[in-house]
Amino acid sequence: MSTSGTRRSIFATPGCGTLFLFLPAAALIGLALFFAGFRPRHAFGLLLLLYGAPLMVIGLLAGLLLLLSFITLARSMRLTDPPPPSRWWALPPFALGVGLLGFIGLVLALGHRPIQDLADANRLSSLKSATLDVEASTEPEGSWAQWRGPRRDAISRETHLHLDWEANTPKVLWNKPIKGGYSSVAIWNGKLYATDRDGKNERVLCFDAETGDELWNYSYPNDYGGLEFGAGPRATPTVHDGKVYTVGATGTMLCLEAEPADGKPKLLWRHDLMDEFDTEAPRWGVSCSPLIEGNLVIVMPGGPNGSVAAFDRLTGKLAWKALGDVGGYSSPIAGNPGGVRQIICFTGEGLAGLDPKDGARLWYYPWVTTFEGNIATPIIAGNYVFISSSYNKGCALLEIVNEAGKLRAEPVYVKANKLMRNHHSTCVLHDGHLYGFDVNTNNNSAILKCVDLRTAEEKWADRSITKGTLLFADGRLVIQTEDGKLVIVEATPEAFRKKGEFKAFDSSQTWALPALAKGRLYIRDGHTLQCLDLRRDSK
């Protein structure tokens, strides 16, 4: 006699089947809501997180109970028995699963904002004759005292440099040990400033730029927690008027004496940006390099309580804060597009022009990228601003239009997921042409390209060089690849012409931008700080 008819599944209890169908649904809905709000951009994201997390936990526990019920049901029936009428319940879960997959897809779709190609014929025509002026430098000759050099454009005005390495590679003047980090170095008044991480402490270090002798270091504890790529600081020190300003990977901002009389570093003021602005460090660490503008030092904490902040550079007192965007990885830059002095900031959600006096928003252009991956520094050329992002985003050239004193950003062209997709490094602009790495982050492939800024026309492309960072000097591109090579390429739109290379480091994460001052090139990886002699007349 079969016992299958006398055994009861939990689903035979009135209401239980419906309940156990609802609970897995709650699990999936909670999962979707949780991930939609996991890196919240606005209050809506926090709401999703608030409701999604408990739904997910409750639903997942219910899902385990449902699995046990399936096992109980299977054991209570013989495989040879005809399917009982109660087995109709297999259809609703199937339909429910299809519907929930569609719902999750909708949530993901709402979080993705693709761009489309655009070209404004009238603005492109005007661009052909437009002046592409660059910001004048106020730094003393022979300095590289901040991120990307005197004008934050990675262009050196030094000449008579040894940048043809096909016959003779450069001479290494010195090597010094350094700990982990991706930050570049700053050179000011014969001294070199760097940051790294030694164990659980971040450090600010000062070296003699000519000899490499360490003069002092300032160390402070810094818990990286779950920070991805936790080797060390990302932001480059800024040196100005006898003071050095730094930002660590978790948002510790310091102002130190650059040249202490007794040789002992002195902390002048400090801010813990993530705590003070009640926000979280981006998954890959705080990367904004401080910008000096007048009496202010400007950084980008990110988050709803002020994604950009300005402090009095002498006292450290907060002067203003602006925007509420999620943080990105770019650094601010100052300029005069549209004939108005402004701070241009590339956040995790868009590009903004801010009044340096009070942080008032002058204009805004949305540019949402996967992982908030807006990393490259904006490039200012006259009344135009060029931006570029990888992660399947693309690039755009914007004209900052001034009508009766009111500014707005108008796209000249937008290239969706093509032409130039800067990842870690920023292009350089020379003689109306962009030189940089177009990176496909889907397969981590990179193409070094030359692009005409005025026409968006690709002049040449080369796949032989691993992606890296680059600067311009004396008619050449000086490229440091992520696998530790230095490569020289002629900066001309005519054709790709390589002028030699030099293996500097055995590394797969050489991401720091080189710095050039007084004919010396300074490079680093996570272990070594190196100085190379690029002077033609050196012996």
Which residues does each PLM region occupy?
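Short loop/turn segments that connect beta-strands within beta-propeller blades
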Residues: 208-211, 257-262, 312-315, 355-359, ...
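Membrane-embedded alpha-helical segments of integral membrane proteins
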Residues: 25-79
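Short coil/turn segments that connect the beta-strands within blades of beta-propeller domains
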Residues: 189-190, 241-242, 294-295, 339-341, ...
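Blade-level signature of beta-propeller repeat domains, shared across WD40, Kelch, NHL, RCC1
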Residues: 484, 507-539
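Structural motif
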Residues: 201-204, 307, 353-355, 393-399, ...
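Internal/C-terminal transmembrane anchor helices
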Residues: 83-114
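Extracytoplasmic beta-rich repeat domains
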Residues: 42-44, 48, 173-186, 217-238, ...
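Aromatic (tryptophan-biased) beta-strands that constitute blades/sheets of beta-rich domains
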Residues: 111-177, 203-205, 213-225, 262-282, ...
